[in-house]
């Protein structure tokens, strides 16, 4: 499945709002990775231990998303290891992040803050 296919899933019609990175909508999504754990941004852990390529990465932890430099640095490392797309809660997407995603053809999806992520995971995993 690619990013274009994800947005065509009827149950996700009002869930995945593309905010940037339209040039990467053909990126293949192999799996979903929920990257809110703080350990994935601490220096003793390596992104490559968690990212293997083709992931749709979900980040909703404000302690990560509110720090623009940390967030863009983390996304850059994940991009180097082949992530396919990024999902971040509404209200947590900065203009800098939109520019970064557009510049890297990384589909950036805004997620409704109140939408149960378990539902998103189940729907997408059943399609994968």
Model-predicted regions and their roles:
Residues 1-128:
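Alpha-helical/coil-rich non-catalytic "connector" segments in signaling and regulatory proteins
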């Amino acid at each position: 499945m690619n990013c274009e296919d994800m947005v065509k899933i009827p149950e996700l019609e009002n869930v995945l709002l593309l905010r940037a990175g339209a040039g990467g909508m053909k990126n293949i999504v192999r799996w979903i990775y929920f990257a809110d754990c703080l350990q994935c941004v601490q220096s003793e852990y390596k992104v490559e231990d968690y990212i293997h390529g083709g992931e749709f990465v979900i980040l909703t932890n404000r302690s990560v998303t509110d720090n623009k430099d940390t967030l863009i640095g983390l996304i850059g490392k994940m991009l180097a290891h082949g992530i396919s797309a990024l999902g971040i809660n509404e209200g947590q997407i900065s203009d800098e992040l939109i520019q970064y995603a557009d510049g890297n053809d990384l589909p950036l999806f805004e997620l409704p803050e109140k939408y149960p992520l378990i539902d998103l995971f189940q729907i997408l995993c059943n399609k994968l």
